[in-house]
Amino acid sequence: EPIESNFVRSEILRILIESKNIQNFIFNNYFFDALDIANKKETKSSNSTILFWEIIYFVAEGNFRGAKVSVSDIYLSLGVSKSTAIRCVAELEDLGILEKVRDSNDRRRAVITLTGKFRNEFVDFLDKMLHQLKNVVDSNAVR
């Protein structure tokens, strides 16, 4: 994939992270349902769902920028406890969204990445979203 595309995707993620209202509407009503992830969980706590998405965004943005994201990066950046981060990452692993791989430079460290299947679906979704945003911008420019 072109680096430019990953940069644009990471910028879209940054915007979504900063705009919680858009994030909650789009992802809770569209993307979660589209992947049937929410239905796999016995409890659909709003706080858990938001934290899951914050972790997914953080990992995805890091992956798109070529960064190696660890559990400690997650809990330090998102301001949650280490145990909460570990539990959420484990649940997201069980759902097939995240996976842990050993860091090639430091075998003691686990790097958190999006699974291939989820990454492909997420990239498709972000690309569709980018296309929709472009259409909105283009239609406003014509006026």
Residue ranges and their predicted role:
Residues 25-28, 47, 58, 65-66, ...:
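N-proximal short alpha-helices
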Residues 66-110:
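Canonical helix-turn-helix DNA-binding module
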Residues 103-126:
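Short, cationic-aromatic polyanion-contact patches
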Residues 22-37, 53, 59-63, 136, ...:
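Linker/hinge segments immediately adjacent to helix-turn-helix/homeobox DNA-binding domains
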Residues 39-80:
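N-terminal helix-turn-helix DNA-binding core of bacterial DNA-binding proteins
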Residues 123-143:
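Amphipathic alpha-helical dimerization/coiled-coil segments
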Residues 1-46:
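N-terminal leader segment of winged-helix/HTH proteins
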